[in-house]
Amino acid sequence: MNIVTFCQIDESLFNPEFKVEYFHTTGEATDADIVIIDIDSIFEFEENKTKVCKEKFVSIAIIDDESDYEAFKNFGIDAWIRSADISQINNIINLVNKRLLS
């Protein structure tokens, strides 16, 4: 599964079977099944999603508080995770894979 992040996340948090690429490393990430964004990267994601993502993809937003959720809900984000719970990122990836990508 290809995951592209638009924000800095410790790659050691991800299961080894996931191919994780940070968008800013090359600026040329493609074929994302899942994209991970935060409040600071939402507009960059919107500008680049057609060239970065597969036709069918899932977006996961990392939120810090309720105001982040309010900002994201108008962008059609598929799933959310609190930044305090980021160590559980694999659980949400597996969940969205089963429910939205299968």
Question: What kind of feature is each model-predicted range?
Answer:
Residues 18, 55, 74-77:
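Short, structured coil segments at secondary-structure junctions
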Residues 94-102:
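The C-terminal output helix
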Residues 66, 73-94:
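Output/docking surface of receiver
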Residues 1-25:
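Short, charged N-terminal beta->alpha structural module
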Residues 56-60:
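Proline-centered loop/turn at the N-terminus of a beta-strand
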Residues 30-55, 65-66:
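Conserved phosphotransfer microenvironments
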Residues 10-15, 42-46, 67-71:
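Short, charged/polar "capping" segments at the starts of alpha-helices
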Residues 4-10, 36-42, 62-65, 83-85:
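Structural motif
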